[in-house]
């Protein structure tokens, strides 16, 4: 950095030294200016002009600037790109400054602490922290924009993996960690260096800014008292954190960081919850992605083709966020689930009441985020007025809720405060249409403060008073063109043309000479100017005080306001579920302890909606039955495009919806609670981390086999296709046997390996199903019905024909297939039909040439093999073939 020489640049350098890792927005008059490297970065990122100071002196200082009234938009862009921004404001009136205007950093904004109005309404903006103590790794996350605060911790060798899984699900914007704590295996750009450039990390599609802090910030002796003091308690036992030192330390580190970067009371952060993943239906990042819960797998399908978009008809921003939260963490508590279902059922049968309730919530803005700006002291007059308007709708919401007497609605009705006292105070304090800022006054309603009214009267009557002086001076001087004007440099002055300046009285004091006129003042005019300007300054001062008192009063009631926002969010989601159930013919799922999972005429909640998919085809519903004994694994065969993947996904989506507490798209649903949903659907190379398609497939499959329980639901689609036919078939075979014998989880296994269908004859819990196809005139019609039994062929060539492969290729493929089918029939002609297992026309890998290997396999107890042992056996068998 060049040595600053002017007093202004010395002041800038002193502030910058305190915030070396932030872009410094330095207030100069009506602009925020940035200098040196900050200016170069900001000009590039914001696409604004880069200029320089002191060019002529040979000591050029790069600089750029943005208007102060538009700064929030520019700052938001930088925050979204991972930068930190320190805002340095003028904290005294430039007119009153004796020398250099005093400036201070009034706020520091980071990706994880921003609470600005441009945040997406449906998602949280989490700041996370990771703390490690011995065998424990603690994790905490705070959404400063809403006040949501949570913490957990894990123990053992897989603790860091589970924390990473939590991060991938939660997707925070910023992570705090001890400077000596190694973080996760992540892709980090080369620009992740010291200075203002953000330190960004990307892990499996999720990106966040990384902020290292000194290790002492995470020390329990320092961090835990911060949490206790914030909540005003002697012990964290009431929050479930009494013996969770790592989790509490992570939470304390967050509070430390927020206190350093923000001002305000943080009254809206009024609670913290300890949670454990096993207390909800666990959906890891792979499952969330594969089921397209929040984001589509392929962007060209449009942002609407997700479960969230399909289920989101909420009326409020808080409802959207709660819907998303319930979707990512469905309940496993049947009492909680049924309480929600009871509330929904009562609304489904009362159409008028349901719609009245939804209309009452329509137009309610983001109470949680408006409140956060109040407590952080960044709320402007329009924010407070917006809050009051939201509060004004609450009596209608409470009145509409009285029609519904389910237990959960009665609780929510009691939690929902109409906040009439705060509403009335805001309305009686602020004008109907206040300006955004307090800089020019005009915010406080007339009649509220006598001193303010008196000053306003003086200021507002200035035009009339000046007109009277002007008319009097015209008569006294005989100058008909004499005018009294005002500007910010000279204040009030009398302007006389050159032709009449000789008529100016002796008591006129010359202020400025122009080409065509002279400007004068008088003692009377100077005295009045001082009164008017002083009045305007005092008006702004009084209005700031009154507004500050109002904002403080609301912040003091943050607990009431936030509780109302949370209750309103739940009312909104439950009314939303009732609306969907009534308009889409959903049914109420019934939960029991039988271990069964039975769906009658179930539908895919997204694909059945033509407004999202753009398809005019009628969706074909299907049944599904799984249990803990005779139907634990379904082997699903059939052609591509037949609907296998849709069938798998809709089973999982129904489970997720049901445990969110929603009605589901089916004629009937009888379910047992699921503890985890696993998916292995599709494949994608991760070459950046040296992982091939097959390695990704095997890693995900291994995680499923190692962690699934007998209460899990597993979806496996084409396991083994990422390698050779023989290897893939062997792995798929071993996986089914392992699922059947070891995990006893409910599993749907879609495959093109028709050889796997013989397992249904050997394993009591395995059942064959297929997606049906109709052949007509050499063409195939996909009926998309799932029926018992194995498919008789794959129809791969027919699908290739539909895809438009050249006729020559199709004909050659038919000839090759016919030749291989002939070889297969000859190879198995000595076997009985029972020994062959079926009349399948698929190629078999068990020919006379490999009879020795077949015998070896028959002698092997596959039920006692682990997946790794199965792979080793496969390797040995392949060596024999070679």
Swiss-Prot record:
GO molecular function: ATP binding; ATP-dependent DNA damage sensor activity; damaged DNA binding; mismatched DNA binding
CDD domains in alphabetical order: ABC_MutS1
Protein name (Swiss-Prot/TrEMBL): DNA mismatch repair protein MutS
Keywords recorded for this protein, A-Z: ATP-binding, DNA damage, DNA repair, DNA-binding, Nucleotide-binding
Family: Belongs to the DNA mismatch repair MutS family.
Pfam families referenced in this protein's UniProt entry, alphabetically: MutS_I (PF01624), MutS_II (PF05188), MutS_III (PF05192), MutS_IV (PF05190), MutS_V (PF00488)
Annotated function: This protein is involved in the repair of mismatches in DNA. It is possible that it carries out the mismatch recognition step. This protein has a weak ATPase activity.
Superkingdom field: Bacteria
Gene Ontology cellular-component annotations: cytosol
PROSITE patterns: DNA_MISMATCH_REPAIR_2 (PS00486)
Residues binding ATP: 638-645
HAMAP family cross-referenced by the UniProt entry: MutS (MF_00096)
Gene Ontology biological process terms from the UniProt entry: mismatch repair
InterPro entries: DNA_mismatch_repair_MutS (IPR005748), DNA_mismatch_repair_MutS-lik_N (IPR007695), DNA_mismatch_repair_MutS/MSH (IPR017261), DNA_mismatch_repair_MutS_C (IPR000432), DNA_mismatch_repair_MutS_clamp (IPR007861), DNA_mismatch_repair_MutS_core (IPR007696), DNA_mismatch_repair_MutS_N (IPR016151), DNA_mismatch_repair_MutS_sf (IPR036187)
């Amino acid at each position: 950095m060049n040595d600053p020489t002017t007093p202004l640049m010395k002041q800038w350098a002193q502030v910058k030294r305190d915030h070396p890792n932030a872009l410094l927005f330095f207030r100069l008059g009506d602009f925020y200016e940035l200098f040196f490297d900050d200016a170069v970065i900001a000009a590039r990122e914001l696409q604004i002009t880069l200029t320089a100071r002191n060019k002529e002196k040979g000591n050029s200082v790069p600089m750029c600037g943005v208007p102060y009234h538009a700064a929030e938009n520019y700052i938001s862009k930088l925050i979204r790109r991972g930068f930190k921004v320190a805002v340095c404001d003028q904290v005294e009136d430039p007119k009153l400054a004796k020398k250099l205007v005093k400036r201070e950093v009034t706020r520091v904004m980071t990706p994880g602490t921003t609470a600005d109005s441009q945040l997406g309404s449906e998602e949280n903006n989490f700041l996370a922290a990771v703390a490690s103590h011995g065998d424990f790794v603690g994790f905490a996350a705070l959404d400063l924009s809403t006040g949501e605060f949570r913490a957990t911790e894990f123990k053992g060798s897989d603790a860091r993996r589970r924390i990473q899984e939590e991060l991938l699900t939660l997707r925070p914007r910023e992570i705090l960690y001890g400077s000596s704590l190694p973080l996760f295996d992540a892709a980090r750009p080369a620009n992740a260096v010291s200075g203002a450039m953000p330190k960004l990390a990307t892990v499996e599609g999720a990106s966040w800014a990384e902020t290292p802090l000194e290790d002492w910030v995470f020390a329990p002796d320092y961090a835990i008292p911060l949490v206790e003091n914030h909540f005003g308690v002697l012990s964290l036992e009431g929050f479930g954190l009494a013996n969770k030192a790592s989790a509490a330390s992570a939470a304390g580190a967050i509070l430390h960081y927020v206190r350093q970067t923000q001002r305000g009371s943080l009254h809206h952060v009024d609670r913290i919850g300890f949670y454990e993943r096993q207390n909800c239906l666990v959906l890891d990042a792979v499952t969330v992605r594969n089921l397209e819960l929040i984001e589509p797998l392929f962007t060209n399908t449009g942002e609407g083709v997700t479960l969230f978009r399909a289920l989101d008809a909420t009326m409020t921003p808080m409802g959207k966020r709660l819907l998303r939260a319930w979707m990512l963490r469905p309940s496993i508590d049947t009492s909680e689930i049924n309480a929600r279902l009871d509330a929904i059922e009562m609304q489904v049968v009362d159409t008028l009441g349901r719609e009245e309730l939804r209309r009452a919530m329509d137009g309610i803005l983001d109470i949680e985020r408006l409140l956060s700006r109040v407590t952080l002291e960044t709320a402007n007059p329009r924010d407070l007025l917006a809050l009051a308007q939201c509060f004004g709708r609450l009596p209608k919401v409470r009145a509409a809720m009285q029609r519904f007497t389910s237990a959960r609605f009665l609780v929510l009705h009691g939690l929902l405060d109409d906040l009439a006292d705060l509403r009335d105070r805001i309305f009686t304090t602020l004008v109907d249409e206040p300006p955004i800022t307090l800089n020019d006054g005009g915010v406080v309603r007339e009649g509220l403060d006598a001193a303010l009214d008196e000053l306003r009267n003086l200021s507002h009557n200035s035009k009339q008073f000046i007109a009277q002086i002007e008319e009097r001076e015209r008569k006294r001087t005989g100058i008909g063109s004499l005018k009294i004007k005002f500007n910010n440099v000279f204040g009030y002055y009398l302007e006389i043309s050159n032709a009449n300046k000789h008529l100016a009285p002796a008591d006129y004091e010359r202020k400025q000479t122009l080409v065509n006129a002279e400007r004068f003042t008088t003692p009377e005019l100077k005295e009045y100017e001082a009164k008017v300007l002083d009045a305007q300054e005092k008006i702004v001062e009084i209005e700031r005080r009154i507004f500050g008192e109002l904002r403080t009063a609301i912040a003091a009631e943050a607990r009431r306001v936030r509780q109302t926002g949370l209750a309103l969010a739940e009312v909104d989601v439950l009314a939303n579920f009732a609306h969907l159930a009534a308009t889409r013919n959903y049914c109420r799922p019934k939960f029991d302890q039988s271990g069964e999972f039975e769906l009658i005429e179930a539908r895919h909640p997204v694909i059945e909606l033509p407004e999202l998919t753009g398809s005019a085809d009628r969706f074909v519903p299907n049944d599904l039955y799984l249990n803990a004994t005779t139907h634990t694994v379904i082997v699903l065969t059939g052609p591509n495009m037949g609907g296998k993947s849709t069938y798998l996904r809709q089973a999982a989506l129904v489970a997720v919806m049901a445990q969110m507490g929603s009605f589901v798209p089916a004629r009937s649903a009888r379910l047992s609670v699921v503890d985890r949903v696993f998916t292995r659907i599709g494949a994608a190379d991760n070459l950046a981390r040296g992982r091939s398609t097959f390695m990704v497939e095997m890693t995900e499959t291994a995680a499923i086999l190692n962690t699934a329980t007998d209460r899990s639901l597993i979806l496996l689609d084409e396991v083994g296709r990422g390698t050779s036919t023989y290897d893939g078939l062997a792995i798929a075979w071993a996986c089914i046997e392992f699922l059947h014998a070891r995990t006893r989880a409910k599993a749907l296994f879609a495959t093109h390996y028709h050889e796997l269908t013989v397992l249904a004859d050997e394993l009591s819990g395995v059942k064959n199903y297929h997606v049906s196809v109709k052949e007509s005139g050499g063409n195939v019609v996909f009926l998309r019905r799932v029926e018992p039994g194995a498919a008789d062929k794959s129809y791969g060539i027919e699908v290739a024909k539909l895809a438009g492969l050249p006729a020559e290729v199709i004909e050659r493929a038919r000839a090759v297939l016919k030749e291989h089918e002939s070889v297969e029939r000859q190879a198995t002609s000595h076997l009985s039909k029972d020994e062959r297992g079926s009349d399948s026309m698929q190629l078999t890998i068990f020919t006379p040439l490999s009879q020795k290997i077949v015998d070896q396999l028959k002698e092997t107890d596959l039920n006692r093999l682990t997946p790794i042992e199965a792979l080793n056996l496969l390797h040995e068998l392949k060596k024999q073939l070679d």
